């Protein structure tokens, strides 16, 4: 099983490398934040690493049914190939939404928000250095189940990503389903997430899309109501 997992990571790594070596503008999403907040005052802070780079996530329960979130991403890669390619991505988004526990073990969530970022693509041999501004609103419904120390969440994020430089303007509508599992040990949780990106509509077919992602990380849960 370990060999299969290693082989999968190698294949994914090759696909990612080929993706970022392309001269075309591209859209690489960030990790989906699936907080599954319990009640007013809950605060979560987490981070992950994976094929999307470094991701940071924060979520806070404003009330027993309203939550807010802030997410960030940083990715930097350099490839010593014939093109001498480098790629740097910085992205931050904020959102708010509604959550409701249907039972002791089942929750539904709906979050929406907006993000801004910057994508810098350099091909040294081709003397190309392009910076794109990334803008992206999102809408994210999800359903989750909680059993003791284990939780499973299925989210479907809809995004409209726009990439704009001095001479290029690209955009597309995407669907980004993701499955997130969390193993909780007291207030610390280990997170694993995998997801895919599919294009719903684009007027600019030259806009490339990173088709899937894997991410691993940890999340710390602050419960300020525990001692009330």
Kindly give the residue locations of the regions a language model identified.
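Sec-dependent bacterial lipoprotein signal peptides
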Residues: 1-23
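Detector for intrinsically disordered, low-structure N-terminal pre-sequences
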Residues: 10-14, 95, 216
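Short glycine/proline- and aromatic-enriched beta-strand/turn motifs that initiate or cap beta-hairpins
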Residues: 23-78, 82, 223
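Outer-membrane beta-barrel transmembrane domain signature
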Residues: 30-32, 100, 115-228
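Outer-envelope beta-barrel architecture signal
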Residues: 37-45, 54, 64-66, 104-110, ...
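Generic detector of contiguous secondary-structure segments
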Residues: 49-61, 92-101, 139-141, 177-182
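Ligand-binding grooves and catalytic loops that recognize ribose/phosphate and carbohydrate rings
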Residues: 76-118
């Amino acid at each position: 099983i370990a060999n299969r997992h290693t082989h999968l990571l190698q294949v994914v790594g090759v696909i990612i490398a080929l993706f970022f070596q392309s001269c075309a503008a591209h859209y690489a999403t960030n990790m989906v934040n699936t907080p599954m907040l319990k009640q007013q005052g809950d605060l979560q802070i987490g981070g992950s690493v994976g094929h999307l780079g470094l991701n940071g996530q924060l979520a806070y329960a404003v009330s027993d049914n309203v939550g807010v979130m802030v997410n960030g991403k940083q990715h930097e890669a350099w490839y010593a190939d014939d093109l001498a390619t480098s790629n740097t991505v910085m992205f931050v988004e904020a959102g708010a939404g509604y959550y409701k526990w249907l039972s002791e073990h089942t929750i539904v969530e709906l979050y929406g928000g907006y993000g801004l970022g910057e994508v810098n693509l350099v091909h040294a041999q081709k003397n190309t250095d392009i910076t794109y501004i990334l803008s992206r609103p999102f809408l994210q419904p999800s359903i989750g189940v909680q059993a003791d120390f284990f939780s499973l969440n299925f989210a479907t994020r809809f995004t409209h990503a726009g990439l704009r430089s001095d001479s290029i303007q690209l955009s597309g509508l995407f669907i980004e389903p993701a499955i997130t599992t969390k193993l909780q040990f007291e207030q610390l949780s280990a997170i694993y997430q995998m997801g895919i990106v599919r294009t719903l509509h684009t007027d600019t077919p030259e806009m490339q899309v990173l088709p899937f992602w894997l991410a691993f990380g940890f999340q710390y849960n602050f419960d300020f109501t525990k001692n009330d």
